[in-house]
Amino acid sequence: MDFLTAIVLGVVQGVSEWLPISSKTQVMFVSQLLLSATPELAYSLGLFLEAASVLAALIYFRLVYLKILRGFLGDAEGRKWLTYVIVTTAATGAVGIPLYMAAKRYLLLGASAGWLMVVLGVAVIFNAVLLQRARSVAGLKTFDDMTLGHMALVGLAQALSVLPGISRSGITTTTLLLLGYRPDEAFKSSFVLVPIAGLGATALAYLSEGGAVATPEVITAMLIGLVVSLVTIKALLEFAKSKHVTLVNIVVGTLAIAGGITRILLSS
């Protein structure tokens, strides 16, 4: 891998991780195109580069993670965030690890993963249309309204993102939007989970491929991905804070559909 390829991979990871398109799939595609990597190695490389997203989330949401630490000491708000992380992680681990093993063994799963993203995207757009027509207060939930059931659903949704073609941020943000959360709260609640899911993905990739993914060039791509991620997070959260709730839902849904269709076309 040369320096230019590392830059391309870093930019792809830094942008696609936070959008409703699968960063793993985009990195896989670029890796196979520029490096002629095998599907298995490209898949593991896509997972390993999520370490860049982990660092970006830890930096950008450092105050939230400090609250989580205070949750161990009894802080009420921190305890809510701590519970959220524990419940979603447990649900993700219970379902995600077996799915990862299956994906590695039967790589790739074809167009089915893409169809799931298309269906979710259509659901979000349909939900946005209903909210606009009803002019109700739905879609205004904040993190304080999060229930254990909602946490578990987010964790289960996140587990599906180990499959090629399914975006972690896309499927978790979509789930939260469908549950009626404000767009900025949905994005934030999704992004805060990146370190847990990302560390797990990076560890699985390293244990699977070892030195093949932990090269100096890949580390360079990771650092570039970190910088691009910080810029992307800020831009997305500013957009989500706008009063155009319906527009945010439609944009997220459209990107999810586009990502799903891309996956279907690549599988055909």
Swiss-Prot record:
It is a multi-pass membrane protein. It catalyses: di-trans,octa-cis-undecaprenyl diphosphate + H2O = di-trans,octa-cis-undecaprenyl phosphate + phosphate + H(+). Keywords: Cell membrane, Hydrolase, Membrane, Transmembrane, Transmembrane helix. It is found in: Cell membrane. The keyword RNA-binding does not apply. Its EC number is 3.6.1.27. Belongs to the UppP family. HAMAP family: Undec_diphosphatase. This is Undecaprenyl-diphosphatase. It comes from Pyrobaculum islandicum (strain DSM 4184 / JCM 9189 / GEO3).
